[in-house]
Amino acid sequence: MASRAEEMSPTKIEIETAVKIEEEEDDEHDSKERVLQRYFLQEWKLVKSLLDDIVSNGRVVDPTSVHKIRSIMDKYQEQGQLVEPYLESIVSPLMFIIRSKTVDLEAKPDEILEIIKPISIIIYALVTVCGYKAVIKFFPHQVSDLELAVLLLEKCHSTNSVSALRQESTGEMEAKCVTLLWLSILVLVPFDISSVDTSIADDKTFGVDDLAPLVLKILGFCKDYLCSAGPMRRISGLLLSKLLTRPDMGKAFSSFFEWTYEVLSCKEDSVTNHFRLLGVMEALSAIFKTASRKVLLDVLPIVLNDVTVLSKSNAAAKSSLLRKYLIKLTQRIGLVCLPHRSPSWRYVAQTASLSENMSTSSSQRLAPDHTVTAILQPESLDDQEDEDMDVPEILEEIIEMLLSGLRDTDTVVRWSAAKGIGRVTSRLTSVLSDEVLSSVLELFSPGEGDGSWHGGCLALAELARRGLLLPRSFPLVVPVIVKALHYDVRRGPHSVGSHVRDAAAYVCWAFGRAYSHKDMKNVLDQLAPDLLIVGSFDREVNCRRAAAAAFQENVGRQGNYPHGIDIVSIADYFSLSSRVNSYLQVAVSIAQYEGYLYPFVDELLYNKICHWDKSLRELAAEALAPLVKYEPKHFANYVLEKLIPCTLSTDLCMRHGATLAAGEVVLALHQCGYVLSADSQKRMAGIVPSIEKARLYRGKGGEIMRLAVSRFIECISLSHVTLAERTERILLDTLTENLRHPNSQIQNAAVSAVKQLVQSYLVGNDKKSVDLILKHLKHLTDPNVAVRRGSALALGVLPYELLTAKWKDIVLKLCSACKIEVNPEDRDAEARVNAVKGLTSVCETLTQKRASDPGNDDLSLFLLIKTEVMDTLLKALDDYSVDNRGDVGSWVREAAVHGLEKCTYILCKKMETYSEGDYNDDTSSLFDSNLATRLIGGMLKQGVEKMDKLRETAAKVLQRILYHKSVSVPHVPYREKLEEILPNKANLQWAVPAFSFPRFVQLLKLRCYSKEVMSGLVISIGGLQDSLRKASLVALLEYMREGEAKDPKEQQSRESALGDDILWILQEYKKCDRVMVPCLQTIEILFSSKIFLNQESYTFSFYAGVMDSLAIELRASKDFTKLKAGLAILGYIASVSHFISTKAFSQLLSFLGHRYPMIRKAAAEQVYLALLQNGILVTEEKMEKVIEIISESCWEADMETTKTQRLELCELAGLDHEVVFKTRNRLVIKDIAGNKSAADENASYSSLVDSSGF
């Protein structure tokens, strides 16, 4: 039974848990909390557990919990409203701890402060997220707390902050801020503060008019904090505004203003005084916001005078924050001067009442504007009182200061001034408000700067939002807003005005919210095209989005605007994020609706194609083309007539944009089927000769004009504009000059133009065609590298009709141009890249035309591609040229990889056109197994080298070759294995070494590919890039260990094959340091990984081959990395118990007399290690003496000393020192003899160190 009861106990526990849950659900707060935690504060459970731990312990036990809570709250910095439902649950218990601990503060001040500081950090984090107004609602506010809070502030004030960095904050600053906020609530107690201050009871000297000690303490602390640069300055100003505006604080109020007068009158120019000024201004602003008019009227003239003087001082000129506070205080002084009233003349847009609508008949249910009714209050006695209102004389000065604030250079000052204009105007009469409006409109004069326009827009928006801008003023305001929407002033290499356009869009947004449909109908008709122009064509994304938001607001609030919903769905927040998408997609879609096409065209024509930004001009010209289809006649008769004269403008921006735009429009007209008149075609044909005649390619802007002219020629060629023979020659000469230009962009644009020009005008003219080809063939060997680059590209785009006459010469010349130039001064990687691309294009052009002719059985072209082109491209894979830009040969290799792919398809397609009966020796040999092996091997080599991009390119090309859907590539050795390693999957990460190398090393098993794979692999293993070296080495070692795990014979087979491949590399790349250095480093790493140390028969032949290579490679070498790797290899071989170790040991001893001290030292280390591991090198009785000489000699000393020690070692080792010397002579003495001038070995050594990068 007992066991049965124990089995039942979990059920009992579940029942008890359910009862607890039901009890919790009865609690209204907990229920709301569970609902909110799913939708608002996602981390509430964690926060709650941390808070419960703090509350239960009465302090923060784990300091990391504070950091966790603060990190969570920081995530809600921009959405504080999500945290507000939890504030009471967080703040109340924490403040209860602070209050309870403060009671014992005098007894244990330091200990209590250490408890309060971390709690204050949490509360202050909530203040920064939710704002102080939301947080202080849950602060305790009993009368007795006032003295406790002042005591706590006194203790905190006497503690200096350890650090100002937030990450290192220990809570001093947060504790002061929280205490000041707590006092801002407590000083509002509805009793005389002197009656709360217990210290007065024992003070018999305290008089009736004296200030309570508590008040004096608070005032003293606040004055100190007003000099602070932290948040205490702002909070102390808030506290002062609450304290000094109490009815019983008249004397404190007067004394504080006397102190502020002294501060504002101080001329001291120091950092402390600057922050004191900011604090005083902030405190005065808070006081003028809180205090009653009656209290402030007495001090108002003095404060205004101080503000006027200070606004003209150097301190204000230097500090935008000070100017902001001056403007804020000025507007509040103005509000104090005027009685608070809601002006009867104000415009009010009132939403129709649902209950009223329900009570009316269905015929009268809807107002004319459907939802909003404008209310202008009728004239009454109140209006007469408004007009008779006495306006203080100082108000004019205040408004003038606010208007000057609208011209300020800083946005924060202008924004504060705009709000001040709105607030002050709301208390003025209708006549005076019109005067204010007139003054604001004066800010939009042409002579004003961008700051004035921006401030004016902000002020207009504020007036509109408050209903202070009446509809009768729209005729004056709307034209100004339209100008502001297009405000863009050029200043040097840039322009200003984006903030003005953004503010103008804000004004339009405010209009939509403030006014009824019937008042806004005509205004919206005027503003809509301009808003959409800004939304579609503005350079800045924030302006485009602001204009689109303003249009959306107006459409949503102003009723049925034509096509409004459709346009809003097109021009949304995301579609406008891309400038290209805005120009080419959004604008084109909007232009289809009535009323937008012509404004859009005019904007592009008059403002955008002459824009200072080159990319924007190009985009504007491109954007004109898709608009042509809506009104071709307008573009042909009007737009082109405007553009043609502009192509010769003295303004570079204008002529560049006009040339581009003219070409794009002509091409778009052609695509629409619109035929230009003969006169228009003649004028278009004369643009380029006119530019030539005006010599507009020279001087500033010549390069971008060449780009524009090339694009223009391409467009008119595609449009088949009628050209005279002389004009054709001029255009061709122009493009030839552009092809010679060193700028690659100009060359590429010229190549595109040549392709279309030749296709449209030179096909069929044999003489011109041959001359053109011969000229470019000659240019392929021109000393000027830019000429070679351009001609190679030009030959690649010529049509079949031109290529067929000289096809063999062209192919052979381009093959020759792909090879590395013999003269180092003539070498140019870009020329070879272009030659490879041109050669590939020529082959494609020639074969495509011939493939479409079934009667053409001539295989000479295809055989030439196989023998010459493929061989040239395979050799281009070995282009490892390097200059000051790095591995520029990689550009050639990448182009060759793509070229090989295309030529492979050409040959395989040709083979597929023949049936089995039609095969002959020539046909079957177009693509044989030998060529396939060379092709795949070359690709695989690129797939395991050090360039990430090239590895990815090679792997993807191999994938396409293996899995091409329409072309089958035959005779690929081990195709199944290749398909296993390179699966037909997209998005494989071939550029990631950890992914690609483990796959490619498996190909070392295949003897037909292993040499190429290994020759690329050693480059990666011995390279400088650490991550690449590690990934490639791990892949190789895992491959070798995998064989060992399977079968020892498999391991030996793999080692033997690997050794053969390495020996092949050593012979193939003899004296080529690019390969030899990493190859030697790879051998060293393999030896260190216990590979090739198993003393099988093949390993000894491997040792012999490596040593033969080392004898050649280390001879007269000055490469420290190479020498060090070679010595390490000799050391490993010398450690093997075989007769070959004696030879390696002898070579190591020869390096003990090397002229470089570091090499002698490295050789000595290897000799020492070899002796420890191989006992046959020296007899046992001599071993101790040899070890002693090696370890105790200074091998970095002078060479004569080291030679003596080496001689002694040779005698002890039983080696004929003359043989060793002869070996050394054969290795390095020749180099020493050839450099007798280098008498100082340290000088030579320093050069070695410099060249080695140490």
From Swiss-Prot:
GO cellular component: plasmodesma
Signal peptide positions (record): none
Disruption phenotype: Embryo lethality. Embryo development limited to the formation of a few giant cells lacking microtubules but not actin filaments, each with one to several nuclei. Failure to localize KNOLLE in mitotic cells. Presence of abnormal endosperm with giant polyploid nuclei.
Gene Ontology BP, a term: tubulin complex assembly
Keyword set, alphabetical order: Chaperone
Protein origin, superkingdom: Eukaryota
Stored InterPro entries: ARM-like, ARM-type_fold, TBCD, Tubulin_specific_chaperoneD_C
GO molecular function, a single term: tubulin binding
Role according to the record: Regulates microtubule function in seed development. Required for development of both embryo and endosperm tissue. Not essential for cell viability. Probably involved in the binding of beta-tubulin in the multimeric supercomplex.
Record's subunit section: Supercomplex made of cofactors A to E. Cofactors A and D function by capturing and stabilizing tubulin in a quasi-native conformation. Cofactor E binds to the cofactor D-tubulin complex; interaction with cofactor C then causes the release of tubulin polypeptides that are committed to the native state.
Family membership: Belongs to the TBCD family.
More details: Belongs to the PILZ group of genes that disrupt, when mutated, the microtubule cytoskeleton and produce mushroom-shaped ('pilz' in German) embryos.
Record-given protein name: Tubulin-folding cofactor D
